[in-house]
């Protein structure tokens, strides 16, 4: 919890906008229904117009539950699936967000807050920047972030 709080602070997310639960790590499949109920309640309370979830092909068991139960809970809401290349067999790269240098610096700083993951190659600054360059190249800009468009609702 300490790491996510620090990362959110770097991103400018107010502590009162961060909602954390105590589901045990790597055991989300056992709590699938409870997680769905939390999300349904959040949908009712917040009524978001966009929800960003792990992409539908993320193989990490906890991410997979969040992605699929999130789809069920927010099915009447626009949804994007974020990219975690080390966990995804595939991702449909259909939504791009152009990033500027300050955005990328902020992302690098936020990822550095996850000190317990610092030994992993994907948590390093070089990987984060390289992926942003790759995604930017795909759409003709310097940096970008990709999302899978799970559901897009225009009203």
Describe each model-derived feature in a short phrase.
Residues 55-56, 83-85:
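Histidine-centered beta-alpha loop that forms part of the nucleotide-sugar donor binding/catalytic region
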Residues 33-36, 94-98:
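Short, surface-exposed amphipathic charged segments that create phosphate/polyanion-binding patches used
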């Amino acid at each position: 919890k300490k790491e996510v709080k620090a990362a959110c602070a770097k991103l400018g997310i107010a502590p009162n906008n961060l909602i954390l639960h105590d589901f045990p790590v790597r055991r989300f499949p056992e709590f699938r229904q409870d997680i769905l109920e939390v999300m349904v309640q959040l949908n009712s309370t917040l009524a978001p117009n966009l929800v960003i979830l792990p992409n539908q092909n993320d193989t990490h068991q906890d991410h997979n539950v969040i992605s699929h139960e999130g789809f069920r809970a927010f099915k009447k809401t626009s949804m994007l699936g974020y990219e975690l290349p080390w966990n995804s067999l595939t991702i449909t790269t259909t939504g791009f967000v152009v990033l500027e240098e300050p955005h990328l610096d902020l992302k690098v700083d936020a990822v550095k807050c996850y000190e317990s993951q610092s030994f992993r190659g994907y948590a390093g600054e070089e990987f984060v920047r390289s992926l942003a360059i790759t995604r930017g190249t795909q759409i003709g800009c310097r940096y970008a972030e990709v999302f899978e468009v799970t559901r897009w609702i225009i009203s």
